[in-house]
Design a protein with these regions (language model features):
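Active-site histidine-anchored catalytic micro-motif
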Residues: 1-96
């Protein structure tokens, strides 16, 4: 993930309200505000940098016998903190 205003996480897909809760809590913890010390673009962009730094931009997974090993209640989510906009992502597979 080459972006500084996006993140990647694993979260449960079972209840869609859970993603709303996650989004609400991220916004509560790191609100968009005009008094960030680094204001290179917009307040939303500045908040996006902080959110991305705290939540992370990469996740490691295990692939076993050609299958992605996720728990039954796990899905991969891309988190957009300064958009929508076009994004790219990269996948790297390496052996043990």
């Amino acid at each position: 993930n080459p972006h500084s205003t996006a993140g990647l996480t694993v979260y449960s897909p079972w209840d869609p309200a859970g993603l709303e809760d996650l989004d609400d809590e991220i916004r509560r913890l790191i609100p968009t505000k005009v008094d960030f010390k680094h204001q290179h673009d917009t307040p939303q962009d500045a908040a996006g940098h902080v959110k991305s730094a705290l939540l992370g931009v990469s996740v490691t997974f295990i692939i076993h016998e050609g299958k992605l090993m996720l728990g039954g209640s796990q899905s991969i989510y891309f988190l957009e903190f300064d958009g929508p906009r076009s994004r790219e992502f990269f996948v790297k597979i390496q052996e043990d």
